[in-house]
Amino acid sequence: MDEDINKDTNNNNNTTDSNNNNNNINEDEIIFNNYINNYSNYLNNNGISALDLLIQGRDGNNNIITFCSEIDQMLNGGTPLKKITEICGVPGIGKTNMAFQLLVNTSIPFDLGGVQGKAIYIDTEGSYSCQRVREMATHLVNHLECVLLKNPMTQTTYIPTVETVLNSIYYYRVYHYIEIISLIHQLPLFLEKNKDVKLIVVDSITYPFRCDFKDMGLRTRSLLSLAQNLMNIATRYNLAVVVMNQVTTKISPNQKESILVPYLGESWTHICTYRMVLFWKQKQRFCHLYKSPSFKSCFTPFDIVEYGIRDVGFNHPPPLNPEDQEQEKEKEKRKKKNNNNNNNNNNNNNNNNNNNNNNNNNNNNNNNNKNNDENEMYIEN
């Protein structure tokens, strides 16, 4: 009797396994068929040539600068659009400050080398500081006004205010990896209505995935799906994606030393287009361009000061109060007026000189005519 029960149980288990296998096969067939159909649709559309891609790269929008010229130079002009850039480092090194600087710099006008757009900040750790962002926005506006005062010939029709900069930043707070996956999945609906968004910052990508996953394969699949969606969004909507990553300790095989490596493992390493590692060296902050498809690996120092990310030793002009701004504008007006008056006086002098020259020429012509008449009279006599 027991043997019959065991046989029935084994048969049921085998039937269940067979059903599961059949379900898996059916799911695989559905996925395969969908992929084949989508691939056929891709082939039906006209492709794009390498020359067109090159022209698009040359004629594309400006990069998002960091206000550290050495870092911008490493990236050939700043944080690139249509790419995923990862910034990783130990706590307190300046990752969040770098994120805040990129957020406010997204508002820089086209005429001054910016992208003149808006930004999305996805906060997973509660790191956002309204006061710090407002401080950076104030110094950004002051910097742009100083640039215009020093270069009055600069042609621009738009200078943002502090309120405009802050109003251009959309903030989202998430607490769980399912929330961030859902948010990224729904972002295209938001971006269709807000096509001037040029930056998405995730600070940090690490925190939602540091919880203990019972299935590490699930974590890897979730990360890959999230990264794929971010890459599609960056390419489709012509914007930059910047993700912050923490570091963890890795023990060497011989168990004699340990090193700090970016979190999330090797699979995540191949996802990002650029990787910048921030680190300390002799009490100085450094930025190391660790991974890049087109630039060599290099590093440069940078500072975090009251007004944001800057070059080491950079002297920022003092902020202008409203009275100083009015005085500077009046000086510029007087200078332009004096230049115009001088130009008018020079033109008048030139006209007078031309008139004098014309009079002299007329006198010379009259004298020549008189001499000719006298000579003719002499010949006749």
Swiss-Prot record:
One of its GO terms (cellular component) is replication fork. ATP binds at residues 89-96. Keywords: ATP-binding, Coiled coil, DNA damage, DNA recombination, DNA repair, DNA-binding, Nucleotide-binding, Nucleus. GO terms for molecular function: ATP binding; ATP-dependent DNA damage sensor activity; DNA binding. SUPFAM superfamilies: P-loop containing nucleoside triphosphate hydrolases. It is found in: Nucleus. This is DNA repair protein RAD51 homolog 3. It comes from Dictyostelium discoideum. Belongs to the RecA family. RAD51 subfamily. Pfam families: Rad51. Involved in the homologous recombination repair (HRR) pathway of double-stranded DNA breaks arising during DNA replication or induced by DNA-damaging agents. It comes from the Eukaryota. Residues 8-24, 339-370 have a biased composition (Low complexity). Residues 1-24, 313-381 are annotated as: Disordered. InterPro entries: DNA_recomb/repair_Rad51_C (IPR013632), HR_Repair_Mediator (IPR052093), P-loop_NTPase (IPR027417), RecA_ATP-bd (IPR020588). GO terms for biological process: meiotic DNA recombinase assembly; reciprocal meiotic recombination. Residues 323-377 form a coiled coil. Disulfide bonds: none annotated.
